[in-house]
Every structure is written in structure tokens, then in C-alpha cells.
Design a protein with these regions (language model features):
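Extended, low-polarity segments enriched in aliphatic/aromatic residues
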Residues: 1-314
């Protein structure tokens, strides 16, 4: 991998890496330890790994119980229709912070890091971890006015200014470093594309982002604008050891050894769309990203479409 990732930005003194850790379901896909280890072996700089808490990243149970609208429910309920709608109306998470849930999700996160061998990897490599949820909820965040001024010197204002209050002070202090969106290659399900751009949705601090999902495209692109204003952005999408693949049913495809990468995340994702059989013109957030960060090369996408069966012959 070192010979492939020969970009001066990847030789920076400090590199921030955002893995894809939305959950632990291998059939959905998440960044496993082996792939992250391979990336770390290819980099010489000081490494900072960042991610938010996720209600789906923990032991396989329903999570803690709580009362919502007079009924006893648990975390799993929040992923369903009524729970999701309830969460849209309670975006402050005060019920979660005050009811013992915060301690539980901390324990779940430690379980995840231990269970999937990230703790050992980070200790071995001297990796610093910055949890976005923890930092923002503890009040250790950058001045939103500073973030607003920096972002709006380069890009149009965010649709919702709450986004400016979601940057950990520790990450802000590292501005100017390289930031890698280290995403998982997945065959889309119902045209849901999750590559290097969508990986930034995990930089929002909410452990489940139902409120932000109401304005998904603008929330995602505004988050990317924030980090593109602070860092040198680099996208890597990997299908090294396995990828989840949808074709009538779920499948796990092993040992493809695929790596897509580049500074232009819009182009990386658009070409990947071509490879997996999705028209990027039909993905609304890619269209918005193109308007914001610049156009991708349509010819490259057509080349990817033509090569798709060679890359994925199943």
C-alpha cells in the first residue's frame, strides 16, 4: 500500500483518519482492524483517529431502556419508525446524557475497540483517538464563530449553523494537517451510496443522526465544508479483505484487494459509482458536492462503467 499512496499530503507530520465505524454488522460493512493496520503501515506521520459514538456500535443487545412518550423502550427502538420520529423531535440528547446512557455508550465503545483489536493496534502504533461526541458534549469544542468565519471565506454559509458547533477543539488545533476519509467499499443497496463523502456524516456528534437526516444532503455537505476548510482532504475507499455486496440477497465477497484513493473525493466517489453500477448523476448529495467542491470527469465514470464487470464479475 505504501507504494500506491505516494502523495505528498500523505507524508504530513500529522494525519487524521476517519474510519467507517457506524456499526459492527459485517454484512453492512465497517472498517476492520486489518485494513486500518495496513493503512497505518503505509504512513509515517503521527496518527489521530477520529469518530463519533454510535448506538449501533456495541454488543448485540437492545441497549439501555428508557421512557419515551410514556412507554418503556430501548435504544433499538430508536432505529425504527416511531423511535426515529421521536428522536427527530428530541435533538438535544439531554435525556441520554442525564440517564446513564452516556456511561453505557462509553463502555460500548471500549468494548468495540477491544473486541475488534483496535485497542492493541492503537497502543502498538501510538495512535491518538479523538471521539467527536465525547469532545463536543464535554464542551471541548472549537469556537463556532471561528469555524463559521473560516468556512465562509471559502464556501457558501451552512444551511444550519449548528454545524459550526460540532468541531472538537483538539481537531481544530490540528488544522492544516491531512485528513483521510477511510471508507468501506460496499455494493449499494437501493442506490444508497456510502463511500468517502458519506463517511463524513459520522463527524456529527449525535450517536444516531435522525435529526440531521431530515436534511441529509445539506447536513453532509456542510460537514464536509467544515473539514475541507481546516484540513487537506484525502479520500480512500477500501475493499481489501471483504466487501458487502447486494444482488437480490446480501453476500460477503472476500479478498478483492481493491483500493480507490485521491484528493478529489467527489471524483473518487463518482468513479466508484460507475464501478458498482450506479449513476452518480442520480445521487443527490454527489450532485450537491459537485456544485460545492467542483465537477468530476464524466469520461472517467464512463470508463468505470465499462470496466465494472472486470472488477466485479459476480
Amino acid at each position: 500500500m505504501r507504494s500506491l499512496l505516494d502523495d505528498p499530503w500523505l507524508k504530513a507530520d500529522t494525519i487524521v483518519i476517519k474510519p467507517n465505524w457506524v456499526g459492527t454488522d459485517r454484512s453492512y460493512g465497517f472498517t476492520e482492524c486489518e485494513a486500518l493496520h495496513m493503512l497505518l503501515e503505509a504512513l509515517d506521520g503521527r496518527i489521530v483517529v477520529t469518530e463519533s459514538y454510535s448506538l449501533g456500535r456495541g454488543p448485540p443487545d437492545g441497549g439501555m431502556k428508557f421512557t419515551a412518550d410514556g412507554k418503556e423502550v430501548d435504544w433499538k427502538w430508536l432505529f425504527m419508525g416511531k423511535g426515529w420520529k421521536w428522536l427527530e423531535k428530541h435533538p438535544d440528547w439531554d435525556w441520554f446524557k442525564e440517564g446513564g446512557h452516556w456511561d453505557r455508550i462509553r463502555k460500548n465503545d471500549r468494548w468495540f475497540l477491544d473486541e475488534y483489536e483496535f485497542t492493541d493496534l492503537f497502543n502498538e502504533r501510538g495512535v491518538e483517538c479523538v471521539n467527536v461526541t465525547e469532545e463536543v458534549w464535554q464542551g471541548r469544542k472549537a469556537d463556532p464563530h471561528e469555524i463559521k468565519n473560516i468556512v465562509e471565506t471559502r464556501f457558501p454559509p451552512a444551511i444550519r449553523e449548528e454545524i459550526y458547533s460540532c468541531v472538537p477543539r483538539r481537531l481544530y488545533d490540528l488544522r492544516g494537517a491531512t485528513f483521510i476519509s477511510f471508507a468501506k467499499l460496499k455494493k449499494p443497496y437501493r442506490d444508497i451510496i456510502s463511500f468517502t463523502l458519506k463517511n463524513f456524516f459520522g463527524m456529527l456528534p449525535d450517536p444516531l443522526r435522525a435529526w440531521w437526516h431530515q436534511w441529509f444532503d445539506s447536513s453532509l455537505i456542510d460537514t464536509i465544508k467544515v473539514y475541507a476548510s481546516l484540513f487537506n482532504m484525502y479520500g480512500i475507499c477500501e475493499g481489501l479483505r471483504y466487501i458487502p455486496w447486494w444482488k437480490k440477497t446480501k453476500r460477503i465477497i472476500n479478498d478483492l484487494g481493491i483500493l480507490a484513493f485521491g484528493r478529489d473525493l467527489v471524483s473518487v466517489d463518482a468513479v466508484l459509482c460507475g464501478l458498482v453500477g450506479v449513476d452518480p448523476e442520480k445521487i443527490s448529495y454527489i450532485k450537491l458536492a459537485e456544485e460545492t467542491f467542483g465537477a468530476y470527469d464524466r469520461r472517467r465514470v464512463e470508463e468505470a462503467k465499462a470496466a465494472a464487470t472486470d472488477w466485479f464479475p459476480f
